[in-house]
Design a protein with these regions (language model features):
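Residue-level recognition of strand-loop junctions within catalytic nucleotide-signaling folds
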Residues: 66, 96, 140, 179-181
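Conserved PLP-binding catalytic core of the aspartate aminotransferase-like
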Residues: 108-109, 122-156
Length: 195
């Protein structure tokens, strides 16, 4: 990553790295680009709270950069009402809640590993290793479509993503978010019942 940023710096190219899902990674320190912002003023790392803190309507995010020139330009072009007071206050509270961060991270990491392991041993499905809060799964059983799996999940009051509209995927795929252990077990039961 640093080599790319360095080459972009030589060419006067500003780089933005989206780390919206970084909180879900096993070792944040190994993959974050934030330390590079101290060495390169052509870099900004952006993060949001909507994914990890389950607050999609909040629309709260932040960026880290050492570029005073970029910050000045950003402030000049920024919509004066880009963040309302409720969003600012809530975002501040969320980012200060160390217990939520620690507990949620532990739950996601353990449940993601457990779900991946269980699906890996379930004939008819091929899960793909993930660093996010969701797992992509290919359906291997002939005649079983992603829509069939979606419908079965909905009937059991579980929401998954039918990936048939993903142009880059050929074949039958579903994607699901990591949930609490009970709901994950319910999803495993639904998936197992279809093969």
């Amino acid at each position: 990553m640093e080599q790319i940023i360095r080459e972009c710096e030589k060419r006067n190219i500003f780089v933005m790295i989206d780390e919206t899902y970084v909180e879900f990674a096993p070792c944040i320190e190994e993959i974050t680009a934030i330390p590079l912002t101290k060495r390169y003023d052509n870099l900004m790392v952006i993060r949001g709270v909507s994914k990890f803190y389950a607050a999609p309507g909040l629309r709260f995010g932040y960026g880290i950069t050492s570029s005073e020139a970029f910050l000045k330009s950003l402030h000049q072009h920024q919509n004066p009402w880009s963040l309302n007071s409720v969003g600012a206050y809530t975002g501040e509270l969320l980012l200060k809640d160390a217990d939520y961060f620690r507990e949620t991270r532990a739950l996601i990491l353990s449940e993601r590993a457990r779900m991946f392991a269980r699906l890996s041993h379930m004939e008819g499905y091929k899960p793909y290793a993930a660093y996010g809060n969701f797992i992509l799964v290919r359906i291997l059983k002939g005649g079983l479509t992603s829509f069939d799996v979606f419908e079965a999940a909905i009937k059991n009051r579980l929401m998954i993503r039918d990936c048939s509209s993903f142009e880059s995927l050929t074949g039958e795929y579903i994607r699901f978010c990591i949930m609490n252990p009970e709901d994950n077990d319910r999803l495993l039961h639904v998936l197992n019942s279809l093969i």
